[in-house]
Amino acid sequence: MPASPTIPEGLDLIPTTDGAIVRRVWLSWRTVPLALFAVVWDAFLVFWYWQALSRPSTPVMAVVFPVMHVGVGIGITYYVLASLVNKTDVAVARAGVTVSTYPLPWTDNRTLSADQITDVLVRTRTWSRNSTTHVVMYADRARKERRLVSGLSQSEQAEFIAQVVRQTLQIESTDR
């Protein structure tokens, strides 16, 4: 594999016999406010149900109404836990690319053979004025863009992953 540029913060490059693994640790300072919010949200719901179910005659709506909020709380808490412990490995070899996230299950795990990938691109997604994420996309044989790795907070991380994939698979970017 040709010389790589500086490895961006939050990524590790692990050489293998036929390519490399780019490892991204999810943990970042952005997790802290959401973790605090999850604690407050979940504590409120525990308090709510504690109060509602400790009374002898609780109205049904007092138990049913917050069920949707419990679902949201479970989702936020799972995301926070995943953000604290998960890693994503992008294993690139001449034969193809495997993306795996662990230890908590997450979406976007995939294995692609090299002949399925014709180009690798970086896209920026803007969610609000101050919130953007970067996505590494690949173009398939039909030239349709598909997500390879998402949720990257720094463009340098996305560009680095894209470059490692391009170099290992010997793809020349068309920068569509």
Residue spans of the language-model regions?
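Extended beta-sheet lipid-handling architectures
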Residues: V90-V92
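Alpha-helical transmembrane spans
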Residues: R23-T88, T174-R176
